[in-house]
């Protein structure tokens, strides 16, 4: 069964494909407190997602993480013992890749959020660079999030977990996800033998390759971390012109809320 990486099992979203709860990093280890300064914890209408700060006023997450009431937490490591420089924001405006909320295609699961107030760079807060070029096959990339660390049980950690996975041939994902186009604006990434994966609660979080955000956690298998079932990540590089255009003030070709 195809799994959308969202936390609440009872949440019903109007998508054109089957879904379940969002996902956490399985097979990883607790992240170092200083290696995820860009990572955002998103609470959206009772569900948990991840996100990525790309400059002091803008962040990226998955479109399916959208909600009427969203709280965005920056500079967080331990949820139980927050860092002193933790900052909380809400969206000032949300932008979806032209009408992506319809979810008629796999490659539109991206949301650009303008914060109600800029965040201040600090010990635990700093943006992640946008991609200068797309990653090649077999590139080693990092995934991270507060999602569940068990592929079959909901065991959520206090601190984000990190793991390394690889960019894999897109044919691997096309074999598992019906209707996925060969030239889809997505990346296929994982470990072919299984054991490492994003899982429930990780939706919207980053796929980081060579120090840049290359993907956004979108869709995966259920249970998580199964062999030869890689995760689909929205390909940030293919949305780069749109992202830069929105930030520059050109909102004509989008569906803002």
Curated annotation (Swiss-Prot):
GO terms for biological process: proteolysis. Residues 1-18 form the signal peptide. Snake venom serine protease that may act in the hemostasis system of the prey. InterPro entries: Peptidase_S1_PA, Peptidase_S1_PA_chymotrypsin, Peptidase_S1A, Trypsin_dom, TRYPSIN_HIS, TRYPSIN_SER. Disulfide bonds join 31-162, 49-65, 141-209, 173-188, 199-224. Glycans are attached at residues 102, 120-121. It comes from the Eukaryota. Its EC number is 3.4.21.-. Residues 25-248 form the Peptidase S1 domain. This is Snake venom serine protease KN8. PROSITE patterns: TRYPSIN_DOM, TRYPSIN_HIS, TRYPSIN_SER. Expressed by the venom gland. Residues 19-24 form a propeptide. Keywords: Disulfide bond, Glycoprotein, Hemostasis impairing toxin, Hydrolase, Protease, Secreted, Serine protease, Signal, Toxin, Zymogen. One of its GO terms (cellular component) is extracellular region. It is found in: Secreted. One of its GO terms (molecular function) is serine-type endopeptidase activity. Belongs to the peptidase S1 family. Snake venom subfamily. The active site is at residues 64, 109, 203.
């Amino acid at each position: 069964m195809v799994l959308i990486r969202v936390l609440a099992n009872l949440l019903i979203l109007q998508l054109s494909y089957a879904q379940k709860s969002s996902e956490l990093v399985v097979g990883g280890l607790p992240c170092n407190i200083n290696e995820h300064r860009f990572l955002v914890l998103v609470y959206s209408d009772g569900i948990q997602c991840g996100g990525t700060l790309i400059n002091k006023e803008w962040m990226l997450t998955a479109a399916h993480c959208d909600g009427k009431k969203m709280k965005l937490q920056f500079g967080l490591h331990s949820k139980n013992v927050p860092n002193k420089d933790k900052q909380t924001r809400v969206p000032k405006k949300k932008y979806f890749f032209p009408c992506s909320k319809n979810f008629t295609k796999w490659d539109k699961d991206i949301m650009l959020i303008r914060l109600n107030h800029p965040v201040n760079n600090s010990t635990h807060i700093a943006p992640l660079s946008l991609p200068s070029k797309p990653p090649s096959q077999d590139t080693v990339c990092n995934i991270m999030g507060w999602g569940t660390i068990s592929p079959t049980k909901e065991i959520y950690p206090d601190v984000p977990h990190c793991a390394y996975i690889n960019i894999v041939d897109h044919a691997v994902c096309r074999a598992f996800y019906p209707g996925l186009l060969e030239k889809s604006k997505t990346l296929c990434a994982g470990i072919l033998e299984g054991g490492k994966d994003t899982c429930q609660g990780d939706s919207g979080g980053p796929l980081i390759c060579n120090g840049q955000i290359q993907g956004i956690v979108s869709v995966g298998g259920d249970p998580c971390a199964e062999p030869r079932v890689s995760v689909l990540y929205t390909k940030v590089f293919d949305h780069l012109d749109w992202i830069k255009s929105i930030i520059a003030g050109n909102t004509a070709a989008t569906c803002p809320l």
